[in-house]
Amino acid sequence: MMHPSGAVLKDAVERCQGFSANLREPLRRLEVARGRVVLVIGCGDPLLMASCEPVRPWRRYSSFLVGADHAPLLTEHRGTRLCIDVGLAPWAAGEILGEGVREIGRQPVPLEAFLGRKAERLAESLAQVCTWQARFSLVERFLVQSRKQTRQPARGEIRWAWEMIERTGGRIAVTALSRRLGWSHRHFVACFRAHTGICPKAAARHMRLVRAARMLAREPDMDLGMVASRCEFADQSHFTREFHRLAGCAPGAYRRFLEIGATSPLTRP
């Protein structure tokens, strides 16, 4: 279930979704980085996750954070689980969760390791409310309160640069952004990374991947060469290499995974 962000968080929250499942058989998915920090608050049976590149063993997570540049992840779930998934612009994640969120790296981080007892109390509160509206309101209050307490606003120039990268689907040159700000390239890259935890070139790569992944999902019959062209990759070979580097599989394998739905294109690590 999708939830529209309130006015206070509209600039920060790019997506807020609720999920509820009771599964007898395991469901496996491939999760690729989409250039945003993802906060997941969950209760019930934990989620199994394993990094694909580099290969890591399966670990159990209930509530967790993943960074904007996380490694391709396999997730597997069986049983009863309820969670809310919040996608945050990386600059906003720093405003809400503190600058430490910019250093979480490419692997998932258990939320309790980042927020301590606050994470456990949040999950317990989520388990006690019975409607989606109440659950979304609970999470929204947490985000608003955390933002007020952190008091680490991102620079307006970085927020603007992030919006431009996102609006163009990663197709704007980093040098064009620094020129429009009147900054040196080196200063812009350093400042962008300090506020988001990711360099602007990596952000653009992920935005372009998101655009390509959406096109693969929405246009199942479109030729891969056409997808590469529309997303402004140099050619299909470049598209395949870049997609594999960021998603852990080739675009054709990803498309087949979407068609199957419940089976990952990757083997279990």
Question: Where in this protein do the model-derived segments appear?
Answer:
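Conserved structured core elements
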Residues: 182, 203-206, 237
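DNA major-groove recognition helix of helix-turn-helix
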Residues: 192, 204, 242-244, 255
